[in-house]
Amino acid sequence: MSTINGCLTSISPSRTQLKNTSTLRPTFIANSRVNPSSSVPPSLIRNQPVFAAPAPIITPTLKEDMAYEEAIAALKKLLSEKGELENEAASKVAQITSELADGGTPSASYPVQRIKEGFIKFKKEKYEKNPALYGELSKGQAPKFMVFACSDSRVCPSHVLDFQPGEAFMVRNIANMVPVFDKDKYAGVGAAIEYAVLHLKVENIVVIGHSACGGIKGLMSFPDAGPTTTDFIEDWVKICLPAKHKVLAEHGNATFAEQCTHCEKEAVNVSLGNLLTYPFVRDGLVKKTLALQGGYYDFVNGSFELWGLEYGLSPSQSV
């Protein structure tokens, strides 16, 4: 297995019916680079923000040094203009009152309140406005995509790629890794792949890596052998040891940060290769009912790369 510019160019698994000409090549690149000195946040595909943080429920424009009376007057004015915010304002006031009573520290009820408010917002803005969609989803799911993504809180695929409910069957773990077929050691991952391919009949499996990945940094830092200092993490990230070895061989003189970036992409290629060890995945590829794709989300610069497994050679495409 070899790569060019972080993309797998050939795969020759021992147990496969695939032709030796199978290649992984870049098929799509979407960039939205920004000036580092700019105060404007980088944007992604479909002009979505990089960080999809919940919008504040109440957003009055108040001066930092506003007196108590002015703040109360401003709140009353806002509610007189937007009466629909009364319930939400009452909830916020109750939360602030509780925090002040506890000496200004966040209330122990904050997590519950945050989840409650999040669901209310979702139900009002998404669920109740899309009855047809959620009516169909109540009958079952038929996603076209299976996505392997990192557990990192900054890289939720639903936000980054604008996936809608029912559109993608997702597995998230440390460093978005796919282990080789193993009924005993990695049954959880195997069960997800089996269900997605054989029962949901997904048409695409996408493995998405990302910038500044802590799991990949760990892989590049941990010794390859010997005693471990963690219960699970070191053994897990070693799934992609071949990526680490390849990066060190080809980029031995690069800085550690540069090596990590190379490994973030190369680990995706290793996971794509590991998918070929699953019999039902190979069968889907041979029958052309399934496609494998690798992706890389750079949230530092606001860019996304996508490359795919195809038979034979054809011109690369970029946008």
Curated annotation (Swiss-Prot):
Pfam families: Pro_CA
GO MF annotations in UniProt: carbonate dehydratase activity; zinc ion binding
Transit peptide: 1-98
UniProt key word Hydrolase: no
InterPro entries to which the protein is assigned, alphabetical: Beta_CA_cladeB (IPR045066), Carbonic_anhydrase (IPR001765), Carbonic_anhydrase_CS (IPR015892), Carbonic_anhydrase_sf (IPR036874)
Matching PROSITE patterns: PROK_CO2_ANHYDRASE_1, PROK_CO2_ANHYDRASE_2
Superkingdom as given in the UniProt entry: Eukaryota
A GO CC term attached to the entry: chloroplast stroma
Reaction(s) the record says it catalyses: hydrogencarbonate + H(+) = CO2 + H2O
E.C. designation(s): 4.2.1.1
Example of a GO biological process term: carbon utilization
Keywords: Chloroplast, Lyase, Plastid, Transit peptide, Zinc
Top class in the EC scheme: lyase
Subunit structure: Homohexamer.
Family of the protein in this entry: Belongs to the beta-class carbonic anhydrase family.
The protein's name: Carbonic anhydrase, chloroplastic
Species the sequence originates in: Spinacia oleracea (Spinach)
Lineage: Eukaryota, Viridiplantae, Streptophyta, Embryophyta, Tracheophyta
